[in-house]
Curated annotation (Swiss-Prot):
Annotated organism of origin: Xenopus laevis (African clawed frog)
Coiled coil: 907-1019
Listed Pfam families: Drf_FH3, Drf_GBD, FH2
Gene: inf2
All copies of domain GBD/FH3, residue ranges: 1-330
SUPFAM superfamilies found in the cross-reference section: ARM repeat, Formin homology 2 domain (FH2 domain)
Region of interest (Disordered), residue spans: 348-391, 432-509, 1000-1019, 1064-1085
FH2 domain ranges (all copies): 621-1009
Protein name: Inverted formin-2
Record-annotated WH2 domain positions: 1037-1052
Length: 1099
């Protein structure tokens, strides 16, 4: 086949794959397929296979669906969805494949068999939640819809949904379980997707029948700034969004009202009110000490710390358990109460910690993943049930906080570890030799134990044995008669061989270490898993010496002696040397296994050095001439010596030739040497010019030079500016800095006593000499500074004083404020009728800020909202009250006390300067006397303005019925500003609520019109689409339709009180019956044995 024909063939195949296909070919190929064929096709993910499967699922009966589920069809779909989500959506084909796959899952859940199978088998919802880790918004929308439907379907589905969100939080390392929902809601601009997210929030809240659980779930969302998000979402003015937001707010207000009834009018969602109630409850009792200690401890918890959420969740669990035990621990002490608080989780937590230690060691050695269920003593550690509702990590942290401390260095466990999957995996092994110690962990060092030697032969000094850690490359002893290197005079003359070694060994004798023979007491045999996983060899027969086959590699790391050099090859136990051999040297055919290193154990890797035995001449090293200079390098790649030795190469043959070519090393050294650094001749020292003379320290000299450079003129001009009192080139900061740099007394004396050439002085010293020639230079600079400061202060304070005075007049002269306060007074007396706060003649002005704290029975309506509605209908002019307070709001934030302080302080400075000027030189008097007097006159006028403000403050206090000595103008203006903002916000809220009500009414009318247009049955009743869908088995679609409309959620929210009063089982059965419209729950397909194996492996 030519190249052109091959290209045409490839393009043709690609065209067939990418070109349009027949719809029957895409979706009709699985119309009558059996479950086995569908399972096979699912193993090849494609749009064609998923589309055909979706159509087959829609037309399947219960028997076909059961077979499909038993054959792990749902497992294949969820696994494929998880893998596709991990790819991202870099290609359109992957996005389409994800959508078709999730549509198959939705179609399967639409059937009774499918959704019941998912609800009754844990793990599927977790797998489904992992598909949220994708950038495909359509796929995430479908997954969230399925989670919302599961929450409403049954309590079991609600628990599985919460467990899946908790699992997703752990997998993605998020801080809160609902963060995935709120993060998507805040970052998305897709309105349908935001509607789905809000519906998930409502479904999670309405999925539980317990009031406290609903409030807790809702508060979790509120803690993630959901209320702020709802305010932004209302601005989008989408009908579906408004429905979900309205459902959330209505249910919130109804639950809050129910809580008020239960807790006697205490708003349990208000932190301050709950704390005040608790404080008043225990303030007059000894329990207040414990409350204070608890609060002090909570205050120490860092909110930004990563473990802070876990600590707060654990404390919440502990408090809930304490509430349950409050009536049943009268005769217990503190220790018994603590044991009861954690008794349900304490044992499992200990077992879990012990199991984790063991399995960690096993997993490190065998390099496998940690099983889900394992125990250290043959018992299975099971996870908490999903229905508990308490995060597992919180319980673990709670147990860790309350459990007694344990020693870190204690042995984890010494008994064999049995698991369900691998039979026998040992965390540690019991050694067969009685005197050998137990080793808890192969990775840990074991303390050495001294072993006394028997009398014959004499003991080796410093030979202390301990079971060594693995990983050391052992070194063998050279044959005698030479002494062991590194031992020096420590060894006595070699003793004669001990026949049999029987009298020196205990019974039963453990196997000897190679190279040690009978001179040392035997150490324990190698641990299983440390020496190739081989069992220890049997002990040698007496008198056999080195005739036994070699034992397995010995235990490395025998501490107490220095490691000997490597052995000479060929010195096996079968060819003993002429002198008597060391006992135990035999049994090792060449090359012998290395013996344990006898030095102190370190973590370094010891590499054995290659040496040669007697009678074997090693290859002589090549003789290389050493250059006398540093040479340039030749970049080559060396061939290993063993390669040259073992092969018939050119290098091996060239080395045997006698006639060799010698290079001219001297010429090479001259041509290829590195350049040498030239020796510098000693330079003749040059005389440095004499330095400038200065009487200032280096720091002050530098600062003064920097100060003078900013003028960019000679020093004489700066002095002339000071003499003339010209402030055009001086500002306040420069004058303050100038005062700090004035010469001190000793500097003045040194400069005046200097009689030599002035030109030799530094620039700073010369400036000081010029400055000293100006009479009263410091007083002149102080006068310039005070004049600048007073002019600036007057420009700032005078307009502020004017505005404050005007704000006082606005409050007193406003005719709308008294009318509004009279209206509030009447409403307040009506609400407080019969109480000690009723029948009031007036109220503090700060009460205006509390109008929003009194909430109505309807959502988002406070007392201020209602009063503004009344004003809008009956007193329209009062709506202009914010215009009367506009100037007052601008004054808020001005520090009036600071104005008094600055004015009085500057007046005092001016009087002091006047006294100094009166005794100064004549030219200074003429120059600054008038300026200082003008400043004093201006400050006196400002002081009169402040006095007028003080008088108006007294009038305002009398107008507001406040104490003049305690009234603060700053607080009064801030209160008016905050009230004005609340007034405007409530006015806007009323307007928005009316517009939303009009839209909601139009939508209701539109739905009612659609209901009337529907087809009617024989009895004249409307045939509802929901009932028809339920008969066809479309459970998910029906639930999502009700969630989208808000009808089911509103009905659930309105009947919460009745549902809480009913038994839990009754309400659950009623909910299930309403959803399924059948009197009996469908049968759940049994889990196939193969399916159980798959689940076990995945866990």
């Amino acid at each position: 086949m030519s190249l052109t024909e091959g290209a045409h063939t490839k393009w043709g195949v690609l065209k067939q794959k990418l070109g349009p296909q027949d719809p029957d070919q895409i979706e009709g190929n699985l119309e009558n397929a059996d479950p086995e064929l569908c399972i096979r096709l699912l193993q090849i993910p494609s749009v064609v296979n998923y589309s055909g499967l979706k159509k087959r699922l829609e037309s399947s009966d219960d028997e076909w669906m059961c077979q499909f589920l038993e054959l792990s069809g749902l497992d294949l779909l969820l696994e494929a969805l998880d893998r596709l989500s991990g790819r991202g959506v870099a290609r359109i084909a992957d996005a389409l494949l994800q959508l078709t796959c999730i549509n198959c899952v939705r179609t399967l859940m639409n059937s009774h068999k499918g959704i019941e199978y998912i609800v009754n088998n844990e793990g599927y919802v977790r797998k489904l939640s992992q598909a949220l880790d994708t950038s495909n918004v359509m796929v995430k929308k479908q997954v969230f819809e399925l989670l919302a439907a599961l929450c409403i379907y049954s309590p079991e589905g609600h628990a599985l949904c919460l467990d899946a969100l908790e699992h997703y939080k752990v997998v993605k390392n998020q801080q809160y379980r609902f963060s995935v929902i709120t993060n998507e809601l805040s970052s998305s601009d897709n309105v349908p997707y935001m509607v789905t997210l809000l519906s998930v929030i409502n479904a999670i809240i309405f999925g539980t029948e317990e009031l406290r659980n609903r409030v807790q779930l809702r508060n979790e969302f509120i803690g993630l700034q959901l209320l702020d998000l709802l305010t932004k979402l209302r601005d989008l003015e989408d009908e579906d969004l408004l429905i979900q937001a309205l459902v959330f707010e209505e249910a919130k207000s109804e639950d809050e009202e129910e809580l008020l009834k239960i807790y006697g009018g205490i708003n349990m969602n208000n932190h301050q009110e709950v704390f005040s109630t608790l404080f008043n409850k225990v303030s007059c009792s000894p329990l207040s000490v414990q409350l204070l200690s608890i609060l002090q401890g909570l205050l120490q918890l860092d909110q930004s710390h990563p473990t802070s959420p876990l600590l707060w969740e654990a404390l919440e669990v502990l408090v809930n358990r304490a509430v349950l035990l409050a009536d049943d621990c009268q005769n217990n002490n503190v220790e018994e109460v603590m044991d009861r608080l954690v008794t349900s989780k304490k044992l499992s937590s200990k077992e879990k910690r012990k199991t984790d230690k063991c399995t960690n060691k096993v997993n490190k050695s065998i390099q496998t993943d940690k099983p889900k269920e394992e125990s250290c003593e043959g018992k299975t550690v099971k996870k908490d049930p999903v229905s508990s509702g308490i995060p597992a990590d919180s319980l673990q942290l709670l147990d860790a906080l309350l459990a007694p401390p344990t020693k870190e260095d204690s042995p984890a466990c010494i008994t064999p570890l049995h698991t369900h999957l691998s039979g026998e995996l040992t965390c540690s092994s019991v050694l067969p030799s009685p005197p050998s110690p137990l080793v808890p962990n192969a990775d840990e060092r074991i303390s050495s134990s001294s072993s006394p030697l028997p009398p014959p032969p004499p003991p080796l000094p410093g030979t202390e044995l301990s079971p060594p850690p693995p990983g050391m490359v052992a070194l063998s002893l050279p044959p005698p008669p030479p002494p062991l290197p590194g031992m020096g005079g420590m060894l006595p003359p070699p003793p004669p061989p001990l026949p049999g070694m029987g009298g020196m060994l205990p019974t039963p004798p453990p196997p000897p270490l190679p190279g040690m023979g009978g001179m040392l007491p035997p150490p324990p045999p190698p641990l299983p898993g440390m020496g190739g996983m081989l069992p220890p060899p049997p002990p040698p027969l007496p008198g056999m010496g080195g005739m036994l086959p070699p034992p397995p590699p010995p235990l490395p790391g025998m501490g107490g002696m220095l490691p000997p050099p490597p052995p000479l090859p060929g010195m096996g136990g079968m060819l003993p040397p002429p002198p008597p051999p060391l006992p135990g040297m035999g049994g090792m055919p060449p090359p012998p296994p290395p013996m344990p290193g006898m030095g102190t154990f370190t973590d370094e890797v010891v590499v054995a050095r290659v040496d040669y035995s007697l009678g074997y001449l090693p290859k002589a090293f090549l003789k290389v001439n050493k250059p006398t200079l540093k040479m340039k390098k030749l970049n080559w790649q060396k061939i290993p010596p063993n390669v040259i030795k073992d092969s018939h190469s050119m290098w091996a043959s060239a080395s045997s030739i006698e006639d060799t070519v010698e290079p001219n090393y001297s010429s090479i050294e001259q041509l290829f040497c590195l350049p040498q650094a030239a020796v510098k001749e000693s330079a003749v020292p040059v005389k440095k010019p004499p330095k400038e003379i200065t009487f200032l320290d280096s720091k002050k000299n530098l600062n003064l030079n920097i100060f003078l450079k900013q003028f960019k003129c000679p020093n004489k001009e700066v002095i002339e500016l000071i003499e003339k009192g010209d402030r055009s080139r001086f500002d306040i900061e420069i004058l303050k800095q100038f005062l700090k740099l004035l010469p001190e007394k000793h500097e003045v004396e040194n400069l005046k006593s200097y009689q030599e050439d002035k030109a030799k002085l530094s620039n700073a010293d010369q400036f000081y000499l010029l400055l000293l020639g100006v009479p009263c230079y410091q007083l002149r600079i102080e006068c310039m500074l005070i004049c600048e400061e007073i002019n600036l202060m007057i420009d700032m304070i005078r307009p502020r004083a004017k505005v404050v005075s005007s704000a006082c007049d606005d409050i007193i002269s406003s005719h709308r404020l008294p009318l509004f306060c009279q209206l509030i007074l009447k409403v307040g007396n009506f609400l407080n009728y019969g109480s000690h706060t009723g029948n009031a003649n007036g109220f503090k002005i700060s009460t205006l800020l509390k109008l929003t704290e009194t909430r109505a029975n309807q959502t988002r309506i406070t007392l201020l909202h209602h009063i503004l509605e009344e004003i809008e209908h009956n007193h329209t002019d009062l709506l202009q009250l914010p215009t009367d307070l506009e100037n007052v709001s601008t004054v808020a934030g001005i520090n009036i006390e600071n104005m008094y302080t600055e004015t009085s302080g500057n007046l005092k400075k001016l009087r002091d300067l006047q006294n100094k000027i009166s005794t100064a030189a004549t030219d200074v008097k003429e120059q600054y006397e008038k300026s200082i007097q003008d400043c004093m006159d201006t400050l006196k006028e400002l002081e009169e303005q402040l006095t007028d403000i003080s008088q108006k403050k007294v009038k305002l206090a009398d107008y507001l019925c406040e104490d003049p000595t305690k009234l603060s103008l700053e607080e009064t203006f801030s209160t008016m500003k905050a009230f004005r903002e609340l007034f405007l916000k409530a006015k806007k809220d009323n307007k928005d609520r009316k517009e939303q009500a009009v839209k909601a009414e139009k939508r209701k009318q539109q739905i009612a019109d659609e209901e009337t247009k529907r087809q009617k049955g024989e009895n004249g009743k409307i045939i509802r689409k929901g009932a028809a869908k339920l008969e066809e088995g479309c459970i998910i679609d029906d639930l999502l339709a009700d969630i989208k409309k808000g009808f089911q959620l509103r009905k659930t929210a309105k009947t919460k009180t009745k549902a809480d009063a009913c038994p839990k089982t009754l309400s659950s059965e009623t909910n299930r019956t309403d959803i399924q419209h059948v009197g009996k729950r469908p049968e759940v397909p049994p889990v196939h044995p193969q399916r159980k194996i798959i689940i076990l492996k995945r866990q």
